[in-house]
């Protein structure tokens, strides 16, 4: 399953990548993106992945700004420390909403759904 991570915290990327490797070894990490601008640029020249893990607060703004520029058609699992965006997340292809710190069980359950 071709997957990308949109996250600006290196420790969170390492944690999520490690968990995904343990829980779902068939996941193919395509890229890691750390900003709204970088994500928009990447999608302009690459095919849609099969799954996205996306943090909401990125260094250059809210990840929801991405949806104003790109029509994302694959499932999204949001990963954030903030619970107040859950309703908004489910309006943009979200299949799950994981609160940080993310553990193995969180990832297992998100991928089962």
Regions found by a protein language model. Give the residues of each.
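CheY-like receiver
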Residues: 49-113
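Short loop/edge segments at beta-strand edges and connector loops
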Residues: 31-37, 60, 99
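Conserved acidic carboxylate
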Residues: 7
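Non-catalytic signal-transmission and effector/linker regions of two-component phosphorelay proteins
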Residues: 1-2
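Acidic, metal-coordinating helix/loop segments flanking the phosphotransfer/catalytic sites
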Residues: 17, 32-51
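Two-component/phosphorelay signaling modules centered on CheY-like receiver
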Residues: 10-34, 69
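Conserved protein kinase catalytic core
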Residues: 13, 40-41, 61
